[in-house]
């Protein structure tokens, strides 16, 4: 299992590019760790879908709202509001629930509790209402989600499901969302810079650990 030393101490003139590069490296590593769906048991496939659903259905809108509350830039708020508008208007949680049920992977209490510690840490981080760090965390998550959708669809297919609305929509729309959130990050940093001792990647690292728990189960995350 690869680990990262997340370095927030970047030069101003290359800050945006450097941050996006670091995020791309982290996402590439997470995608590279994904198991082959064909080598997984039905229960392992079900568990990944169930843990993903247990986290995403009730938390994504909450997390994006937390970022909206945290930011100071008036230019950033419409970017986050547009993301939330799409989530609510198009009922993305309904899409996810349909996808999960069709794959016979509706989360159990055990599924939810298996990621509870990592999920709680992300929630507590967002409760600090730090604009820059919150936006970066959501940019990272959108970047990972759009890369993860093909794998998630393959898991569902192996479970006998043909339901694809959720994975098809997010495999496309989250590309735009990622780009917009990185633009929002630069706008927020211009008016609400973080302090010299702040960890820019605090939320990213916590969310990375949650993703590992979703994909590999909580035992795997102890070594991450």
Give the ranges of each region predicted by the language model.
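Non-heme di-metal
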Residues: 2-224
């Amino acid at each position: 299992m690869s680990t990262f030393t997340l370095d927030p101490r970047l030069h101003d003139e290359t800050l945006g590019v450097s941050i996006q590069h670091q995020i791309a490296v982290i996402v590439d590593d997470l995608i590279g760790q994904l198991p082959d769906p064909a080598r997984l048991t039905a229960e392992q496939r079900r568990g990944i879908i169930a843990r993903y659903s247990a986290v995403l259905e009730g938390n994504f809108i909450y997390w994006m709202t937390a970022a909206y509350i945290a930011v100071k830039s008036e230019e950033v708020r419409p970017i986050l509001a547009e993301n939330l508008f799409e989530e609510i208007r198009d009922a993305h949680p309904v899409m996810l629930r349909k996808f999960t049920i069709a794959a016979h992977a509706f989360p159990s209490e055990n599924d939810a509790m298996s990621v509870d510690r990592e999920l709680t840490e992300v929630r507590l981080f967002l409760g600090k209402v730090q604009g820059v760090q919150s936006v970066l965390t959501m940019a990272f998550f959108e970047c990972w989600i759009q890369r993860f959708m093909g794998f998630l669809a393959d898991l569902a297919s192996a479970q006998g499901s043909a339901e694809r609305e959720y994975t098809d929509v997010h495999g496309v729309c989250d590309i735009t969302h990622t780009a917009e959130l990185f633009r929002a990050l630069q706008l927020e940093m211009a008016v609400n810079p973080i302090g010299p001792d702040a960890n820019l990647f605090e939320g990213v690292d916590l969310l990375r650990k949650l993703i590992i728990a979703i994909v590999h189960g909580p035992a795997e995350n102890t070594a991450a």
